[in-house]
């Protein structure tokens, strides 16, 4: 009972803070926001533009959403910007990979973390992607960080899209442009890991109207929003795609790795990344089993290696497969990014497992797969990723329902040399999709918004 009362009181405090935040913004108040302090960036020149970047996850926390904000922060500093990051509280102990990624950033990047939200009543507060109680803490952290060094522009990267709402208040407070960056969609083609209730939809439309620019990672996402949101200004909706970082490949030049015929002469087909609901292995394992039953000779010619963390719900599928064909797949736990890149470089081919979520977007993994140089086996029925691999001549696309086509793809990969898949189109595409080139495009947007 005491816990229920405590959560109810915390919820009332959150609502009061929300009301104060909205009133202070409307009144253009000079009220000082509270904050938790942080690592204040070293000022490298008062004339340098100052970017305030909202990203709920940031190193040493590590997940698929951190790489784009990290890359922008790194290359913005190199381009002469000052960068302050407002981010969420750390969850758990940082991993070695997360610490390595943090250490890759210039020391002048300021990182300010929101305080953890107090436990509150789910029933008493509006529902929003990322959690309504988190709006105030990250806004407070950002405003405190920039109190004596106002930003030139504010960029909010989502999901979670709670950052968009917080960033809007801070941009209004400092009277600077707000740029929204959609790494995934919010209320249009909503992915399963994003909330899109009534509160989300109301605020998304409000923010899309007020933002100075809206950045999407694919033209398909931009088009979907323009078709779905009435009155959305097409002139301020831009595309800056994801990319790959050449600095991840500095050990050897891109494409220099030799084809992998390791493991006693077998062709190694590698999946590198997290196995979960966006990369489900069960359909692939079923088709692979059908191929091996029908073509025993392939058991001695190839092996599929899965490197990376695996969701518990799919461990049964792996166990079932290994009980029948123990020498045809290999399971490797998560590794640091440098080791993951090395695995991609050594592989004879790279496996991409795609859910229908990727029909309108391209997984970040594909950019690194393309840079690694090996042929790519896309196991998917539809989507932009398969279209891109076909267009670049970088691999093969196999539908999820046909083991005969999967068998044909295996035989094709075994027959063709690695160089067959390294087309001029692939090389040219990589040059225009490096993280440095794309950061330059984003910084141009941030420099020109008003």
PLM features per residue range, with description:
Residues 2-113:
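N-terminal subdomain of nucleotide-sugar transferases
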Residues 52, 260-279, 285-288:
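Conserved donor-binding/catalytic core segment of Leloir-type glycosyltransferases
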Residues 91, 174-179, 187-207, 246:
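Nucleotide-sugar donor phosphate/pyrophosphate-binding loop at the beta->alpha transition
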Residues 162-165, 169-173, 196-216:
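Membrane-proximal helix-turn-helix segments that form the acceptor-binding/catalytic region
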Residues 212, 344-359, 374:
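Acidic donor-binding loop of glycosyltransferase active sites
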Residues 220, 243:
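Carbohydrate-associated surface elements
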Residues 301, 306-339:
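Nucleotide-activated donor-binding/catalytic signature segment of Leloir-type glycosyltransferases, i.e.
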Residues 401-405, 418-447:
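A charged, aromatic-enriched C-terminal amphipathic alpha-helix characteristic of glycosyltransferases
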């Amino acid at each position: 009972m005491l816990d229920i009362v405590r959560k109810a009181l915390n919820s009332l405090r959150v609502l009061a803070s929300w009301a104060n935040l909205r009133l202070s913004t409307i009144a253009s108040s000079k009220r000082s926001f509270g904050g938790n302090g942080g690592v204040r960036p070293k000022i490298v020149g008062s004339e340098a533009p100052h970017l305030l970047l909202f990203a709920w996850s940031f190193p040493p926390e590590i997940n698929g959403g951190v790489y784009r904000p990290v890359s922008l922060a790194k290359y913005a500093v190199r381009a002469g910007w000052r960068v302050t990051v407002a981010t969420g509280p750390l969850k758990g102990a940082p991993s070695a990979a997360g610490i390595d990624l943090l250490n890759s950033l210039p020391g002048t990047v300021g990182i300010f973390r929101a305080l953890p939200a107090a436990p509150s009543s789910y029933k008493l507060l509006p529902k929003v992607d990322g959690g309504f109680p988190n709006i105030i803490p990250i806004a407070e952290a950002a405003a405190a960080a920039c109190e004596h060094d106002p930003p030139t522009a504010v960029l909010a990267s989502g999901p979670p899209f709670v950052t968009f709402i917080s960033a809007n208040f801070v941009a209004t407070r400092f009277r600077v442009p707000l740029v929204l960056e959609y790494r995934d969609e919010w209320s249009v083609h909503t992915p399963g890991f994003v909330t899109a209730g009534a509160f989300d939809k109301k605020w998304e439309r409000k923010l899309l109207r007020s933002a100075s620019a809206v950045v999407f990672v694919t033209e398909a996402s931009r088009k979907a929003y323009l078709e779905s949101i009435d009155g959305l200004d097409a002139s301020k909706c831009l595309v800056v795609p994801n990319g790959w970082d050449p600095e991840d490949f500095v050990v050897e030049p891109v494409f220099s790795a030799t084809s992998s015929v390791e493991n006693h002469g077998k062709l190694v087909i590698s999946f590198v990344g997290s196995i979960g609901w966006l990369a489900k292995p069960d359909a692939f394992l079923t088709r692979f089993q059908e191929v091996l039953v029908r073509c025993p000779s392939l058991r001695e010619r190839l092996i599929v290696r899965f490197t990376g963390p695996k969701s518990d719900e799919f461990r049964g599928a792996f166990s079932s497969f290994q009980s029948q064909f123990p020498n045809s797949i290999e399971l490797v736990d998560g590794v640091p990014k440098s080791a993951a890149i090395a695995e991609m470089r050594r592989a004879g081919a790279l496996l991409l497992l795609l859910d229908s979520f990727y029909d309108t977007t391209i997984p970040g993994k594909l950019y690194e797969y393309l840079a690694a140089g090996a042929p790519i086996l896309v196991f998917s029925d539809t989507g932009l990723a398969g279209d891109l691999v076909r267009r670049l001549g970088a691999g093969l696309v196999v539908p999820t329902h046909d083991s005969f086509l999967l068998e044909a793809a295996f035989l094709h990969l075994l027959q063709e040399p690695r160089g067959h898949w390294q087309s001029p189109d692939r090389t040219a595409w990589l040059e225009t999709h490096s993280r440095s080139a794309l950061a330059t495009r984003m910084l141009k947007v941030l420099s020109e918004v008003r």
